[in-house]
């Protein structure tokens, strides 16, 4: 429940802070990037379809940054796993290079940690 409220709050913030005139959530176009066939993705799919104007899903391992061109917000769901550790070693981010990514993005689960590793962002925790 907390995740739903936080996500909805973020989406409202994105709308409120956009440089263009504000729009309702009915006009918001959201792209969920993750592992589509998981219970988590199915849960987000139901929630997003009820609350935003347009939602589409993209497989994280096949996603190209240009796939997000027609969307207002990207939700990246990138869990930790052995496969993720292999992605860390390859230096591949689903969002491409840090310097070229400019789309408003919500990082779900471990996506923040995973991006920090791949994009070599220094920081800490605690």
Q: Where are the model-predicted features located?
A:
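Aromatic-Pro/Gly-enriched surface loop or interdomain linker
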Residues: 18-73
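Sec-dependent signal peptide recognition
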Residues: 2-9
